[in-house]
């Protein structure tokens, strides 16, 4: 009995202790698997396979991306105030029909990058409860057009729908038949080759993205309410709007870049297009072909609607007056096309044009006059053409007051009117690189062919003259300018004198004189210089004047430097942010500068992995892998001698041992005879 009594007492105490432990545990705050910020639960990337059931009842937003959810059951029913649920990048294949039955307020649903093609019909049943849904993202789910049609069949409240990276091929009027409120639709990166009538009933659609598909043409376009159309990266050869519509098209941005356009698009007669992107096509103008007398020459093309046999269109191929209204265009990008001329007055049809990009075409001449360019032009890029001539008149250039950026690089320009740029009062940036340009001497520039006058251009800040075959820069060349960037690299015969940059000491911030044969130049006056390129100049040592500058970027590539003085390295390491040094002949035994740069975390050696050095045997090694062994006897001289002695003794003993073994093995009688001859002596007894 005493034993039983003691046992009962012990058990009672244990029960009391257990209750205390449980009570204390319940007093601690519960640990959530998500991070909570007000009414937002951040549960992304937590390796979760179910929706947490311990979140606050009033949670409005749940981010559940990058988890392991495969089947969405009733986990959201605990959160009736939910307005946004993001479940992208999971493994979701099915959604229970009752998954959203309590989510009456849900407006934004993101299910991108899952596997919903497995159970799309069940998912569609679940969507029936989402009567307030405004935004839906089903991108990257392997959906066909039929699956999409089922999924969105009852989502009449949708305003934004994202279906990129799926497997849709053909869209028609039934695909989105119930989406009358849709304002934005993204179907990029599918396999679409036909979209006939798919969007005609969407009277509120404003943004349509068709990029990265296989569309062959867009004909009889009449979506007047659309603001932005992106049809880039397709196979479009024709873009033709319905010319019979009198209603004004609201389209502001049209992107047809990276297609197969042969002709300038046939735009609406009444439109508000501001941005027109046509780069990387095959656009050209063909007025010269209109008068061809060949019997087989076609002058018109007919388009037929094979589906309904109505709305047939006939267009004159060579009529250059069918471009529609261009009066509102502000940005025109025709880069990388086949344009070799512009029809008379074509660019002047755009009186609001600010940006004109004509890079990589076939233009041979260009007119820099207000008769051919709108006075609003702000940036003009005619680089990488075949220009041999720039037309200008002294009276008209003064009217291009808004022109600020001009790029004429990589052409075949040789002859310039000397004062061609001085009358552009607001020209800020000019690039003439990769042409044949000379700098005029103020005293006789009028007699030179191809030279350009730069002095007194107060607005000019950035001037690029790389690879222009310049040989001399006179002392008065940049007088009256306030250049901050001057690029003269790749003029190997340039004779740059100290007075050549006279007047730029207080303004110059970037100077490029790589591959100019530079030898002696005093950089100390240019106290505001931040970036300097002196690469490919065969420099054997750094100019001392560099140490007076507060440089942030220095390019020393492809010179003849063998080392950098310790004091120079210390100064540069404190000031520089980025340095390029590859292509020099650094000595592997004089790399103190390398260690100095490595110890200073503020400097970034951009090409560190490529820098090499030469050892005593002229073998090349990566600087980052260099060992002192390449320098011969240095501080470890005594230790190296000991190793050589030990090696010699070891070899000698080995040879002697081998000799003895040979004698004992092959001539055993010779050894006793030799020993007897050498060692035996007559005794006295």
UniProtKB/Swiss-Prot annotation:
Subcellular location: Cell membrane; Endoplasmic reticulum membrane
Membrane topology, Extracellular segments: 28-640
Listed GO CC annotations: cell surface; endoplasmic reticulum; endoplasmic reticulum membrane; extracellular matrix; extracellular space; plasma membrane
Ranges where the LRRCT domain occurs: 597-635
One matching Pfam family: LRR_5
Entry keywords, A to Z: Cell membrane, Disulfide bond, Endoplasmic reticulum, Glycoprotein, Growth factor binding, Leucine-rich repeat, Membrane, Repeat, Signal, Transmembrane, Transmembrane helix
SUPFAM superfamilies: L domain-like
Organism domain of life: Eukaryota
Function: Key regulator of transforming growth factor beta-1 (TGFB1) specifically required for microglia function in the nervous system. Required for activation of latent TGF-beta-1 in macrophages and microglia: associates specifically via disulfide bonds with the Latency-associated peptide (LAP), which is the regulatory chain of TGFB1, and regulates integrin-dependent activation of TGF-beta-1.
Protein name as annotated: Transforming growth factor beta activator LRRC33
Organism of this sequence: Danio rerio (Zebrafish)
